[in-house]
Amino acid sequence: MKFQMIAAVLLIAFCLCVVVTARMELQDVEDMKNGSFQKRRTCIDTIPKSRCTAFQCKNSMKYRLSFCRKTCGTC
């Protein structure tokens, strides 16, 4: 009985994660169609070497979507 409760809770948590992720992706697609995506999420291709830090190079993808290129291309 305890195992079934744990399995049910895990299944519900997984379903909620899937739903939230899907809604975020749909919102991004709508924003792209409306043209507001680029306004809200402006990306730079490279930054000057003088402003490049190890942290920026390690975390060079600015956003999770593939529309943005690496921000530390010159490091």
Swiss-Prot record:
Its main location: secreted. The record marks I47, K49, R51, S60, M61, Y63, F67 as: Important residue for binding Kv1.3/KCNA3. InterPro entries: ShKT_dom. Residues 23-40 form a propeptide. Inhibits voltage-gated potassium channels (Kv) with higher potency for Kv1.1/KCNA1 and Kv1.3/KCNA3. Residues 43-75 form the ShKT domain. Disulfide bonds join C43-C75, C52-C68, C57-C72. The keyword Cell membrane does not apply. It comes from the Eukaryota. It is found in: Secreted; Nematocyst. One of its GO terms (molecular function) is potassium channel regulator activity. Belongs to the sea anemone type 1 potassium channel toxin family. Type 1a subfamily. In PubMed:21339955, this protein is called kappa-TLTX-Hh1a. The TATX abbreviation is given to this protein since the abbreviation TLTX was already given to a spider family. The keyword Disulfide bond applies. This is Kappa-thalatoxin-Cad2a. Keywords: Cleavage on pair of basic residues, Disulfide bond, Ion channel impairing toxin, Nematocyst, Neurotoxin, Potassium channel impairing toxin, Secreted, Signal, Toxin, Voltage-gated potassium channel impairing toxin.
